[in-house]
Amino acid sequence: MRRAKIVCTIGPATDSPEQLQALVDAGMDVARINRSHGKAEEHEAVIERVRKASATSGRAVAILVDLQGPKIRLETFQDGPQELKIGDTFTITTRDVPGTKELVGTTFKGLPGDCAPGDRLLIDDGNVAVRVVEVTDTDVVTRVEVPGMVSDHKGLNLPGVAVSVPALSEKDKEDLRWGIEQDADFIALSFVRSAQDIKDVHEIMDEMGKRIPVIAKIEKPQAVEALEEIVEAFDGIMVARGDLGVEMPLEAVPLVQKRAIELARIAAKPVIVATQVMDSMIKNPRPTRAEASDCANAILDGADAVMLSGETSVGAFPIETVRTMAAIIESTEENGGERIASIPGFYADRAGVICEAAARIAEHLDARYLVTFSQSGTSARLLSRMRRPIPMLAFTPLESTRRRLALSWGIQTYRVPEVQHTDDMVWQLDQVVQSSHLADIGDQLVIVAGMPPGIAGSSNMLRIHEVGDEAECRQHDAHQGEGDGDR
């Protein structure tokens, strides 16, 4: 069973019902809806199709709505793409002007206030670089240092500059409300700079009466500096290596990735490695050897998930890409899973200690599964963060929890009715593993749950169960005949 999860960005190449079903069947665990592109009604149709494909397959598939963020972009060029040569003067202005080879507008009206002579600006993910030579109230005059083509709406990065854009643009606020209305499982916040950035998101969620887990995208130097605080404040992180590799030296990105994964695991929060994991498969049916190694190394670093962007949104081989990624992950886990480092430190909280004890007992007993019954998914994530070789099952009465656990490493989920007694939990477990042929009579299962059942965050029980144990089944039958007051 593959443990690390696969996040797929949905786009024109994969938004049909047939392609979405094929993605799910190939191994997609999370569907990413990129609100930088496409219309709301198109994305609503995609979400509905993903839910149907998930139901058809019987596998939980989560929806991640990725907010565009305050991305700084060029405006349009009246005569199409322009070629900039070394030494050319190129002015970026806040004025409303037709774009030319010498002058173009920007979406960020605060640009002159944030720039100073000597600053280096990068266009189109660094394919073009310019140096600021003069700043006025409305214009940033630059000289071209790295030549190339510029065209409509290309991104503009200011490495090392603390840009004064808000955490949420007006479009982001609209898209956040839309994502909540669509019952998204995760919201990804772009260009996070500090732990405080989650406050604006939570304010809108509280206005709408619903909290959804928020993933912080690590793509700014300020976020790297505040990484521990961001991991603590948010519900998960994404190492967005595209903008991160533009804003920071390329050679710094691998260690940022490793540190981010370690911190997220310690906090028992999901961590995604994103951008160019299988980039060549946008055009080619096979990845490069370097890409295969990159994917495998993200798994060995301990990532919960790896993400595909253009490979599945606009690529020529989206289904093949997911199958290839799944095969690389499975091979890496099967042949090198022991290389995934254990996380440092001790578990100080009660639930963490219980989960650690359960994992050790399961290994000593050679148990078939580690099992958790969970309302919120917390105990499942606590088991997941240890990256133990024993397969893990999570049972929950909540579909929302089941879908959110689709992003967590190694968790196979089942939705079951809510019960009032732990013996009933064990009976449910026995029925599922036998009917699904997951375990044989006599197999040992190590269970983590809370007493009384149904209270989120109450994991306080560890139990060993033998599949098919008639005595425990009789206990369930006895409880079925009792009144609630006797439990």
Whereabouts are the PLM-identified features?
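Non-catalytic helical/linker scaffolds that mediate oligomerization, partner binding
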Residues: 1-487
